[in-house]
Amino acid sequence: EACDDSHPCNKTLACSGNKCLIPYGSTVWDCESGFDCVIGVVCTYHGGDKVGRCTQDHRCQRGACTNPATECDEDEVCGYKEGETCYGPCRKGLTCRLGRCRP
């Protein structure tokens, strides 16, 4: 569902990247993929479930990242740098292929 300042999401969702998405830590909504969660938050699955929760937060804190293999990108996400093993999201412009962040 699209959103902006004049078309807000319902109160249990957050407007992120002009889409109504599940906020970090929500107990109201289940996610099926990381695309269901706000930008920078990953869907975590437990015990083989087909649905999960948006509980892995990779957003920058005060413009910085704590992991030296990541850096804060223009979306304010701590993304893994080129060539790094992708244990979470890759930096904007990179994708995880064969276990590493690549252009």
From Swiss-Prot:
Protein's cellular compartments: Secreted
Domain notes: The cysteine framework is C-C-C-C-C-C-C-C-C-C-C-C-C-C-C-C.
The keyword Glycoprotein is assigned to this record: no
General function of this protein: Acts as a neurotoxin by inhibiting an ion channel.
Summary of the tissues where the protein is detected: Expressed by the venom duct.
Record keywords: Disulfide bond, Ion channel impairing toxin, Neurotoxin, Secreted, Toxin
Name of this protein: Turripeptide OL55-like
GO CC terms in record: extracellular region
Post-translational modification: Contains 8 disulfide bonds.
GO molecular-function term, one example from the UniProt record: toxin activity
Chief location: secreted
